């Protein structure tokens, strides 16, 4: 398969951004889905970092209704890390789009035309895909695994911790990869729950409870990533990114690369996943957690819109 050049994909993202008044039109949605598919294909053969950048541009622009910040010609890169784990994750999630399409097709049918066999088949596919993602999480290198923060500056605490949780990562790209994993699993678990709710004659209580617990855990892990990515940042610090304080874990000191990269693109990568928590958690999250997430989303909008009021927020 011939892959599109990166410039073509960036051009497609720019086109989506330029159609702010039509972002929710059928044509824009088709274009968005097409670009996302090409991004996944590009990533399998190239790098996860490029794909996450492009995907976040798409997701965040849709949330805001307009391009959030001008796209830099060159993205600042953090310290080199192995791309193997990221590439393996993309391969593991390659069936997610088809799974979602199958679920949408099944759920759009009238109940009288939906067979138990179809539901069970989709449920099995979702569970198999989820197992592949869990396997990925157990095989990542040790330096990719999040570590609870040992030092959390008061300014970071004041900016927001959920349930006292704060995890540190090698860099913002690794953190974003983990959030992609979590978001993907939440989507899968939602499909599993939906299938279970369509099987009233089966004893699915234990499985449904397990999915609910999993969604809560994954959502809390995303929340625990926020302090590492945003630090104490409450406003744009383009002129002096080093004024932002960050948490540290044992053996993971704050790097210059993180201080340079996180203020520019950190919230950019978080916003789409946090929006998903508010809209796709299947009622599994408490109001307190949803409220915290919305507060942090508003904080991100404050940072990247230079304090301007965002319509509809």
Predicted region positions:
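Central/C-terminal regulatory/activation regions of fungal transcription factors
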Residues: 2-200, 204-232
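Short glycine-rich, low-complexity/disordered patches
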Residues: 232-240, 312
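Glycine-centered flexibility motif
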Residues: 65, 238, 304-307
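Phenylalanine-focused residue identity feature
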Residues: 97, 113, 162, 228, ...
